Each structure stands twice: as C-alpha cells, then as structure tokens.
Amino acid sequence: PIDIAIRLNQLQKVAEETRLGIPVTFSTDPLHEVPRGGGIAAFSLDGISKWPSQLGFAATRDTDLIFKFGQIASAEYRAMGFRTGLHPMSDLATEPRWARNFGTFGSNADLSSEMTVAYVKGFQGNEINKNSVHTMVKHFPGGGPQEGGLDPHLKSGENQIYPGNNFDYHLKPFQAAIDNGMKVVMPYYGIPKGQTDEDVAMAFNKYILTD
C-alpha cells in the first residue's frame, strides 16, 4: 500500500503542475478479497484488510456487515490515493456457466439490491464528501444473462438473452443503487437481444443509456 500511495502521489503532483492543474481520479478493481488462487477482475493486495467475495457477503445476508466493510475499505483506498472503486458487481447470477458469478451477490434481485445499497453507502457515505470513495456499480443494466455463459469481452460472447422475458428483473439492483445515491455506473459490453430497436452493445445503446 505505501508503494502505491507514493506512486499515486507522484502522478498527482504531475497533474497539479499542468496548466489547468486538474487532479487525477485513480480507480481500482477490488483489492480486499481473501486470496483464492486466481480469478477475473478481483485482486488481493497484501497489507490491507481481507474480506469475503461478494458472493460470500451475500451468503451472510448481513447488510450491516457489508456497510462496515465499505467504510473500512474506503479509508484504505483513500490512504493509497484511490477515489473510485470499479465495483460492486450488481449483475444477477442467472447463468450458471458464466465465469463471473463469484463476483456477484447471487441470483436474487431483492437481496442483490439490498447488498448493493449497503455497499455503496459504506464507500460513499449518505452524501458525497471529502471522505467518499465513489463506487462504479456494474455492469448496467445487468450482465448475468450471458448466452452460453460466454465472455462478452469477446465476439463469441456478445449476446445477452432473456428467455424468461426478465430484463427488468436484472435491472432491479441498479435501480436501487440509483435511488440511493449511486454516482458512477459502468455500462455492459453485451448486446441485449430483442430488447431494443438498436442491436448494439449496451454501452453504445441509446435506449439503454438515455431513454
């Protein structure tokens, strides 16, 4: 952590000395999980507190615990110079073959909504202030229904499918986050098949982002 803080402070100093002096907002993927021998978009950093994965938090059904985690992790992020966390993953784990299910709060939209709100408030506080760390809730409006469980970063996994006509179910945790002070969101990479007039990925889809 101290090496990260030194490096980010050095970079921040460079930014402050530019013509406009606009500071840099540094972000990171999750850093607090107990090591489990590899994974996708989740890392474990020595020297900071260790906690369960999101799926582990969901198993406790304890929103007070995840709120406390957010407060502690937020303080550790600020000490290193990070002001945005590229998490939580509020996708619903409805496709068992999807490789990122471990990073979600599970398949229950109501539970995921409750855990997401507690997570956001733990990191950010009830309102944004100097002690806040933004949470980038992802992947809007829900990355769980991957066709075949394939990776949407690749052409082979570009499609999101909704055989149960449950698009709105996947949206619920994100709506809860928006209603409770979420400030940053990451749109998803997949194409929501049959959901909009634009057959393009969610991050480029006018209906998904603005309508």
What residue ranges belong to the model's regions?
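Glycoside hydrolase catalytic-domain context in secreted enzymes
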Residues: 1-211
